[in-house]
Amino acid sequence: MEELDSQRRRLRLEDGKTLSYDRLLLATGATPQRPDLPGKALRGVEVLRSCEQAATLVATVEWEHRLVIIGNSFIGMEVAAALRKQAVEVTVVSPHPLPFEKQFGTELGRFFRRRHQEKGVTFVDGEPAAFEGEKSVSAVTLKDGQRIEATLVLLATGVAPATRFIHDLPLNDDGSLTVDRTMKVSADIFAIGDIATFPLDGNPTRIEHWRVAQQHGRVAAGAMMDKPHPDDAVPFFWTQHYGVRYEYLGHAAKWDQQEIIGSPDEDKFVSLYGLKGNLVAVVAAERMRTTGVLLIKMGDKHGFAEAQRIVADTREAES
């Protein structure tokens, strides 16, 4: 898309065509951010957001076996796990030593780093300064002077809402659109997914995961058909590493309580996150019955103590 004219209810496409609408759903996703560093245009310096980019990455690792991943967030670490299975040498570079520490806390951050190290991933704490090479990338140099050889680099350095074509609607500082509980931006425009900042427990929230976008889509569809069903659903997504699926319920920008029940190293645990006595998020592995019950209870705004009881009651049944 080239430009949205919300006053005239028109969309101008890149090929020059114009579309008119009565109601519009914006689900444009996000655009990977590329650090503005020397060598960023070298062949082999890749991002991952689309199926086409995934196909390029898979095809490239068939003959290039020294991968450096810049960033240790979900996409970066999921790729690390997937490509270690193919015997690719993987080095992860990040200024933040522990993967997912911001989302899951320090203890689970240490666990994920340890698990990836056990599978052969190398971690380097630092920031990239430049990518070296003639036509193709051959190394990454860091700000502290370290040099890491690489035949392929994945930039897992975050994304930005794909809203550059929007000029006549108010955008937030991060480029997203603010929506209400029905995903409405204005009288005839709705937005979902990566570009939508939505209310969650009274707090403006934006979550970058396709599963949450699916939840948003159902809510927006009802509202666009004049059958609004405000979004009270608990955000839910998962991340998978070395055959283990880790489920995340809710959303915790901060918490003042955390309890891990079970053992992450044994791939069976529940981590509860509480704020002011309320349950705000859950991370779990191989506790599907427990997470199913907690997902329902979180929608009813149950407390942290109630969640502890639920985990205890369901633990024996799942052992």
What residues fall within each predicted segment?
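A Rossmann-like FAD-binding core segment of flavoenzymes
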Residues: 2-4, 8-13, 19, 86-180
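Glycine-rich dinucleotide-binding loop and its adjacent helix/turn
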Residues: 28-86, 123
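Mid-to-C-terminal Rossmann-like scaffold of FAD/NAD(P)H-dependent oxidoreductases
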Residues: 195-290
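Residues at the starts of beta-strands that form the adenosine-phosphate
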Residues: 66, 88-91, 188
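Short hydrophobic core segments
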Residues: 19-31, 148-158, 217, 277
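FAD-site-proximal beta/loop scaffold in flavoenzymes
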Residues: 41-64, 135-141, 147-215, 219
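Cysteine/selenocysteine-centered motifs that mediate thiol-based redox chemistry or coordinate metal-sulfur cofactors
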Residues: 57, 237, 304-319
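A short, polar/charged loop-to-alpha-helix boundary motif
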Residues: 288-307
